[in-house]
């Protein structure tokens, strides 16, 4: 069968893992498969900088990408109420520059869709599949309808994060020009469905596939939960050839954010403790990982075939067994790519050194707050002082930590944010959070599934869905991934987080000097330039040993036990209090943590450049309060 897999706007300009893997799976069965990255054509039309704003910077729940295609999909529906909504509710996040961008981008929608239709009609494709995640829905649906009107014999199919569970069923029920919907992972279901179609057999019985009753046109399915592959080593390598061929049309200087690769699926932490705000993995949290040998072979293949320096691991969480297997194997290589991984915050220094030697240059370690009480509400399984310790250790190991401060959790103590705001100046020499924002309510998260129990009320689709989708209210609820809500106790988190948000914004805007320590002769010299001046503190003997003993967050009783015989218990307490007063020591969660960074590591860090995926093309386009984005779904981009 001749198959086209389409990656529409407004997905990021990077190789799409989901459809590229499906291309390899279908190709292995003898089918002729092409991946059409239509997002590249649209980016060329609106300009790469503006497209970057749409795909990477704009708050995803505002659905800017959906707005662009809304009046094509729902002909005659006015989008003026949506623009009014942007102007009133999201004035900070979507400034005037963004609205100017939308007007320009809107003019490119129809030419873009006609170009896409030309691409489809240039070959005799029998099956056209769309990956639809987050803000790709309306663009994909608009093109699918055009294809069906021109070539009704073509089979149209949808998959991706927007098609999980009841979202997929609502999609199929709402748009009759969509023939098939694949819910969840499609490694098994898509090849099975294509084989059945090729043989002229029924799709009934294939789990995770929604098809149409040929007589009634109604939706039919065996189960919305697909069969999931258990041994990831059986998967082929993703085929990114089409992406790089099409990417060559981008203006010189445009960059992609590394080549994506997966070494695992699911979340081993989420199997035990599902972070309350996390909607990743849909309804399946089952953790599966590739063998170290397979992971290494795939990484070698991708690095050499596509001649890339950056590999972005899309795993929800690193398989910690890799610390003793895959990563040491990688460290032995003379040339290693720069890697990004997501992991947990309770890493040890020895583990960070393994990361460093393996070429991991950036991590997202699941730091979402610096207050243990709030972290417990998130079910994160870590503490505030451990998060600060990791930030300092990342600086010393030369690893870039991506992290966030989320607020607005029901039941959180407002004074937690006052305490964090006071500590920002103490941490000014460390890497600031990417964002400080209210958490977003996503489908499948515990806060969504157990909203009443956890203190949320009036849960409804995000306002943008209601303004853009010309569908019945219940159908919109079934389609939505992002939701608005109210608090059962009537709280207003913005009111008690203003000080922290202002402090974080200042932290992000400008450099704040260093806080370092180094051995000079017999002394431990601490140099503090965080406030613009330069202050020095020289420690020797047992006092220096006490400071070094706080390299790991340590309770007072243990410090007295270790240094009391040399300094005296009272003197240990006096020194710690003095260092806390000087802000070179943090007292948090009943433990003491040295804040000064090794001076040699700090010098190396200043010379290093951020990994390419951290670059922002135009800071003037960054919204004041970008929301935290998530991604998921195998049949996704």
Indicate where each model-derived feature is located.
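Glycine-rich beta-alpha loop elements in corrinoid/cobalamin-binding modules
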Residues: 2, 9-18, 22-42, 90, ...
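Conserved SAM/AdoMet-binding glycine-rich loop
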Residues: 2-10, 154-157, 292-402, 407-415, ...
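C-terminal accessory regions of radical SAM enzymes
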Residues: 5-6, 13, 21-23, 36-73, ...
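N-terminal [4Fe-4S]-dependent radical SAM core
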Residues: 212-264, 522-539, 579-608
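Canonical Radical SAM [4Fe-4S] cluster-binding loop centered on the CxxxCxxC motif
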Residues: 253-292
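Short amphipathic alpha-helical interface segments
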Residues: 528-565
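Short amphipathic alpha-helical interaction segments
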Residues: 566-578
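Short, amphipathic alpha-helical interaction segments positioned at domain boundaries
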Residues: 591-637
């Amino acid at each position: 069968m001749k198959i086209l897999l389409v990656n529409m706007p407004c997905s990021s300009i990077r190789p799409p893992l989901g459809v590229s893997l499906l291309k390899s799976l279908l190709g292995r069965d003898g089918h002729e498969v092409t991946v059409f990255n239509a997002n590249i054509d649209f980016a060329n039309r609106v300009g790469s900088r503006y497209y970057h704003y749409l795909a990477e910077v704009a708050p995803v729940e505002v659905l800017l990408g959906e707005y662009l295609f809304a009046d094509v999909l729902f002909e005659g529906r006015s989008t003026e109420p949506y623009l009014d909504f942007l102007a009133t509710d999201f004035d900070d996040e979507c400034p005037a520059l963004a609205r100017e961008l939308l007007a320009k981008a809107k003019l490119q929608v129809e030419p873009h869709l006609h170009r896409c239709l030309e691409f489809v009609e240039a070959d005799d494709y029998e099956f056209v599949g769309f990956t639809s995640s987050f803000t790709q829905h309306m663009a994909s649906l608009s093109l699918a309808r055009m294809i069906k009107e021109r070539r009704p014999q073509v089979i149209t199919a949808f998959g991706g994060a927007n098609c999980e569970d009841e979202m997929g069923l609502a999609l199929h029920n709402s748009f009759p020009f969509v023939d098939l919907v694949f819910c969840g992972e499609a490694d098994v279901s898509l090849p099975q469905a294509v084989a059945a179609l090729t043989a002229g057999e029924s799709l009934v019985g294939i789990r995770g596939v929604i098809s149409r009753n040929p007589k009634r046109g109604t939706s039919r399915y065996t189960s919305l939960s697909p069969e999931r592959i258990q041994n990831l080593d059986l998967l082929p390598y993703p085929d990114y050839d089409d992406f790089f061929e099409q990417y060559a049309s981008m203006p010189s200087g445009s960059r992609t954010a590394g080549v994506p690769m997966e070494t695992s699926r699911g979340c081993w932490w989420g199997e035990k403790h599902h972070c309350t705000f996390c909607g990743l993995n849909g309804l399946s949290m089952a953790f599966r990982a590739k063998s170290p040998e397979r992971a290494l072979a795939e990484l070698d293949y991708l690095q050499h075939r596509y001649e890339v320096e950056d590999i972005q691991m899309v795993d929800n969480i690193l398989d910690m067994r890799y610390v003793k297997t895959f990563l040491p194997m990688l460290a032995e290589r003379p040339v290693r790519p720069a890697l990004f991984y997501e992991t947990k915050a309770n890493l040890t220094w020895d583990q960070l050194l393994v990361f460093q030697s393996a070429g991991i240059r950036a991590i997202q370690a699941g730091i979402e707050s610096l207050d243990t009480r709030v972290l417990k509400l998130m079910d994160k399984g870590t503490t505030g002082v451990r998060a600060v310790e990791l930030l300092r250790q990342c600086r010393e190991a030369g690893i870039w930590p991506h992290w966030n401060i989320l607020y607005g959790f029901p039941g959180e103590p407002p004074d937690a944010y006052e305490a964090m705001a006071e500590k920002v100046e103490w941490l000014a020499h460390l890497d600031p959070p990417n964002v400080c924002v209210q958490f977003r309510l996503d489908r499948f998260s515990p806060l969504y599934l157990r909203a009443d129990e956890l203190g949320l009320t009036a849960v409804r689709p995000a306002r943008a869905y209601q303004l853009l989708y010309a569908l019945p209210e219940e159908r919109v609820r079934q389609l939505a991934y992002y939701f608005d809500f109210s608090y059962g106790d009537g709280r207003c988190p913005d009111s008690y987080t203003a000080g922290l948000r202002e402090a974080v914004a200042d932290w992000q805007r400008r450099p704040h000097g260093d806080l370092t320590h180094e051995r000079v002769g017999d002394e431990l010299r601490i140099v503090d330039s965080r406030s613009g001046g330069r202050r020095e503190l020289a420690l020797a003997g047992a006092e220096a040993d006490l400071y070094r003993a706080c390299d790991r967050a340590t309770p007072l009783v243990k410090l007295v036990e270790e240094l009391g015989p040399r300094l005296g218990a009272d003197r240990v307490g006096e020194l710690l209090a003095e260092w806390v007063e000087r802000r070179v020591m943090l007292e948090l969660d009943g433990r003491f943590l040295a804040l000064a960074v090794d001076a040699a590591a700090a010098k190396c860090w200043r010379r290093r450049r951020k990994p390419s995926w951290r670059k922002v093309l135009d800071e003037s386009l960054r919204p004041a309060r970008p929301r935290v984005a998530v991604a998921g779904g195998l049949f996704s981009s």
